């Protein structure tokens, strides 16, 4: 079969309207710059995936409506949007060359990027952190606060590590022996 790709600017506008891309990208780049990105996208790189690799990209990283299965971008769109988002606040003088170099590196799989960046950096979630270490002290407010932090980070696709080293050990007394841990 044949298919036609949606030009990047049109794709961005549609995905912002649908609420799946962060609208801030349009504040960072001009339409001319976004059209330039479109000329850099190498669609043939999508054809170099193995079946398993493409399934993983589609299932885990492409922006989509997981309830309907509707996918809103191609792998190359994803890579370009990641590069554009990561370098959006760099100086105008250098950022375009950084976007191109980074796009080329990630779209050719020369470097790997963490799941939260691949899955969420161009979305309204804008998750940049890959792994987060959550500390907890040996008090109920600290334990509950840590639980809340864990829930919020997991909802934003971050990996979690928990430092529970300051929580008392098993068989320790709680409230003077009222409860045993």
Where are these regions (language model features)?
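Extended catalytic cores of very large enzyme megasubunits
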Residues: 1-181
């Amino acid at each position: 079969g044949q298919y036609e790709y949606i030009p990047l600017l049109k794709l961005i506008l549609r995905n912002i309207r649908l609420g799946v891309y962060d609208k801030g990208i349009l504040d960072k780049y001009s339409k001319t710059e976004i059209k330039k990105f479109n000329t850099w996208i190498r669609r043939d790189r999508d054809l170099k995936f193995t079946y398993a690799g493409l399934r993983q990209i589609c299932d885990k990283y492409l922006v989509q409506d997981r309830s309907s299965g509707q996918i809103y971008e191609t792998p190359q769109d994803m890579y370009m949007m990641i590069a554009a988002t990561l370098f959006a606040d760099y100086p105008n003088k250098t950022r375009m060359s950084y976007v191109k170099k980074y796009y080329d590196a990630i779209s050719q799989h020369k470097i790997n990027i963490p799941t939260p960046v691949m899955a969420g950096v161009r979305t309204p979630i804008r998750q940049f952190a890959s792994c987060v270490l959550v500390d907890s002290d040996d008090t109920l407010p600290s334990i509950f606060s840590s639980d809340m932090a864990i829930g919020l980070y997991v909802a934003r696709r971050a990996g979690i590590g928990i430092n529970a080293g300051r929580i008392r050990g098993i068989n320790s007394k709680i409230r003077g022996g009222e409860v045993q841990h």
